[in-house]
Regions:
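A mature extracytoplasmic/lumenal domain signature
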Residues: 9-13, 262-264, 308, 384-386, ...
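A structural signal for short, well-ordered beta-strand segments and their strand-loop junctions
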Residues: 6, 255-260, 302-305, 380-382, ...
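Short loop/turn motifs at secondary-structure junctions
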Residues: 29, 252-254, 374-383
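Conserved, mostly hydrophobic/aromatic
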Residues: 7, 248, 295, 383, ...
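Intrinsically disordered, low-complexity acidic/polar segments
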Residues: 14-17, 42, 267, 313, ...
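Carbohydrate-recognition beta-sandwich/jelly-roll modules
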Residues: 1-237, 242-256
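Active-site-proximal substrate-binding groove within the catalytic cores of carbohydrate-active enzymes
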Residues: 106-108, 116-124, 129-131, 308-311, ...
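Aromatic-lined carbohydrate-binding/catalytic grooves of carbohydrate-active enzymes
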Residues: 206-293, 297-363, 387-391
Length: 595
């Protein structure tokens, strides 16, 4: 029931050193490969939709008439920070975490699965009435990255990746008919495929964890002896963390899983992690060991957070040497990530973050493990490996690492880490899922592109039953009630991010997004959330999310493997479903017998 398309890129021929009419030599490499761009394209009279895995998932209805919109064109696994930086200030919305796409036409559908070359792929989708009369979706593979170098006195020229991607491109097309030919059927079939290929593994427990993020230290400018200095401000000390854990367990919350960010020296912008030293402003090494042991001995789990893919500050005494260990852009400049000044739109170079080359990950992870083991933690949180993927275009001999090779490197290091610890990640790109127990910051929305018509919880349908997952922290979203309903619809666990410090301490810092993180202010809401919603999660946690339906405007139904369903009403008025009244901005839990 499938078609396998393989393109051996190494065998592609293109003109090399051909002579033009002026006698000059030129080489014309293949930059992009589009695979079956009109495969099963839908016509003007067809009904159905295109599935794009944008964020949680989204549908583009066939012939939707939005001919004024841009073509959907997004990179699988999001932005590569070694590519040319944007020439204008932009936001990067939800990214693609799964290399899959689909199209439904009448009672037939196909699912496209990118098996090889996923890290260098873009997904392109468009509707009829623009370029032609077809609705279509296809993958486009960037086998040679290109960039632009601007000259000092005007003009520019193109520059290309030193080495061509040499792996295969492989796309599998799976066909669905009848009742299976919808996005729920696509999600089930893709989940089966991932399980068969060892990319998803069953959950270890059927007891839903209560997820809480603690913010340890963050950089804040303080005036010391008349001189402004950036110091790690202690938002949650190790003693504070123990007090918060005790308070939650005393309130009846069980199976508390703590993600502890900013515990390492330097706080959230921690030092190069070749060592696992604690931030002194939070407490001593002995106190941190005691905290880890205490949480684990009292029925909880702790996931100290670390980022391996970037360096916030390069010190002379650490193991990072920028000229050797930093990733390079195509123009051989060290790759850096910038914040942009909202008034001038200029990059703020003082706060630039250096991108670490995938080439050094094996050495870096080995060094970290050796030092981190002394704390006795059974868990580890990876702040970047689950969503960020960067190349290294260093032109040194044998030093170029394309994005596909980078994905393999990250996957190998995650495998090593998962052999020792339970892993928590952000985002949840596919290559990270085989080694992950918990995924946080999972998208519950799509990017909101104009061409898209409907968001769906496709990602959650795929990973349900095989990973615990949660969306954004409920205390950091603009409408926590609506976001909680979205979490219920998707089977996503509630998630909070708190600190012992008052919220105003982040004012005027890069971390003012934590403007509502004081634990004391959120404590009652956290306990109420647990008491109201965890009886629901005890019924659906560990169950496969097998069917999702759009019942009417603002009303959805999610059905799980054990027959339990959740009907969510997003409207500002009450509705009735199957004889059951559901209040405005409310939900209803239906058990297998319809009660």
């Amino acid at each position: 029931d499938s078609l396998l398309v393989t393109i051996p890129v190494d065998d592609i021929k293109y003109p090399i050193k051909v002579v033009d009419f002026e006698g000059e030599e030129h080489t014309f490499p293949i930059v992009f490969v589009e695979v079956l761009p009109y495969f099963s394209a839908a016509g003007l009279n067809d009904e159905g939709y295109i599935l794009v895995p944008d964020g949680s998932g989204a549908l583009i209805y066939l012939n939707n008439g939005k001919t004024w919109t841009s073509t959907y064109n997004q990179a699988v696994y999001g932005r590569d920070y070694t590519e040319d930086p944007p020439t204008y200030v932009t936001t990067y919305p939800q990214q693609i975490h799964l290399p899959v796409f689909g199209l439904k036409m009448g009672d037939q559908a196909f699912l496209g699965i990118i098996e090889r070359g996923d890290a260098i792929a873009h997904l392109r989708a468009d509707i009829s009435g623009k370029r032609d009369d077809f609705n279509r979706i296809f993958p486009r593979f960037n086998i040679i990255k290109s960039g632009t170098i601007s000259l000092q006195h005007g003009g520019s020229f193109n520059i290309y990746q030193p080495e061509v991607y040499k792996g295969d491109i492989r796309v599998r097309y799976v066909f669905l008919v009848g009742e299976e030919a919808d996005y729920s059927g696509m999600a089930r079939r893709y989940q089966e495929y991932l399980v068969e290929n060892g990319l998803l593994t069953p959950l270890k427990s059927d007891d839903p964890p209560f997820l809480l993020e603690l913010i340890g230290a963050f950089p804040r400018t303080e005036v010391i002896m008349g001189i402004p200095r950036s110091i790690p401000y202690p938002a949650t000390t190790f003693a504070d963390a123990k007090r918060i854990f005790d308070d939650l367990t005393d309130a009846g919350i069980s199976n508390v899983h703590l993600r502890f960010r900013g515990w390492m020296r330097g706080g959230l912008e921690h030092q190069y992690p070749d060592k696992a030293a604690v931030e002194n402003n939070l407490g001593t090494e002995t106190e941190f060991k005691s905290l880890v042991a205490y949480v684990q001995e009292n029925g909880g789990a702790i996931y100290p957070d670390v980022g391996f893919l970037s360096v916030y500050r390069n010190r002379l005494v650490d193991g990072f040497i920028g000229i050797r260990d930093a990733a390079r852009r195509l123009d051989q400049i060290v790759a850096r990530v910038y914040d942009y000044n909202i008034a001038t739109f200029e990059p703020e170079t003082a706060s630039a973050i250096t991108v670490v080359s995938p080439r050094v990950l094996e050495r870096l992870v080995s060094s970290f493990i050796k030092d981190f083991d002394k704390y006795g933690s059974g868990g580890l949180s990876l702040s970047q490996m689950g969503w960020q993927l960067n190349s290294d275009f260093n032109r040194g001999k044998g030093r170029t690492i394309d994005r596909q090779q980078a994905a393999e490197t990250v996957s190998n290091e995650m495998r090593r880490l998962s052999d020792k610890y339970d892993i928590m990640v952000q985002g949840g790109n596919l290559y990270a899922l085989p080694y992950t127990s918990i995924v946080v910051n999972v998208p519950l929305e799509d990017s909101g592109y104009d061409i898209v018509d409907q968001r769906i919880p496709f990602y959650q349908m795929v990973v349900s039953g095989y990973a615990a997952y949660a969306g954004e922290p409920l205390n950091q979203v603009s409408d926590s009630r609506t976001y909680m309903l979205m979490s219920l619809e998707a089977g996503a666990l509630p998630f909070f991010s708190v600190a012992a410090a008052e919220s105003e301490v982040v004012k005027g810092t890069r971390y003012d997004k934590f403007h509502s993180f004081n634990y004391n202010q959120w404590r009652n809401a956290i306990v109420s959330c647990y008491l109201e919603y965890y009886p629901v999660y005890k019924l659906i946690y560990g169950q496969r999310f097998v069917r999702h339906q759009l019942l009417q405007d603002g009303v959805t139904k999610s059905t799980f493997e054990n027959g339990v369903s959740i009907v969510v009403n997003y409207n500002n008025y009450a509705i009735e479903y199957d004889g059951v009244a559901i209040g405005a901005k409310g939900y209803c839990l239906l058990e297998e017998d319809g009660r």
